[in-house]
């Protein structure tokens, strides 16, 4: 059986990266929420 996690750094950045988050209103909400919570790492 194929594993569900097939690592790919390009896809990782495109989907979960900082610039991807900043590009949409909801993504910015995610970053704001993580800042408020005090996360050391905001995005991939």
From Swiss-Prot:
Signal peptide: none annotated. InterPro entries: Ribosomal_bL34 (IPR000271), Ribosomal_bL34_CS (IPR020939). HAMAP family: Ribosomal_bL34 (MF_00391). It comes from the Bacteria. The keyword Ribosomal protein applies. The keyword Ribonucleoprotein applies. Belongs to the bacterial ribosomal protein bL34 family. The gene is rpmH. GO terms for molecular function: structural constituent of ribosome. One of its GO terms (biological process) is translation. This is Large ribosomal subunit protein bL34. Residues 1-19, 31-44 have a biased composition (Basic residues). Residues 1-44 are annotated as: Disordered. Keywords: Ribonucleoprotein, Ribosomal protein. It comes from Oceanobacillus iheyensis (strain DSM 14371 / CIP 107618 / JCM 11309 / KCTC 3954 / HTE831). One of its GO terms (cellular component) is ribonucleoprotein complex.
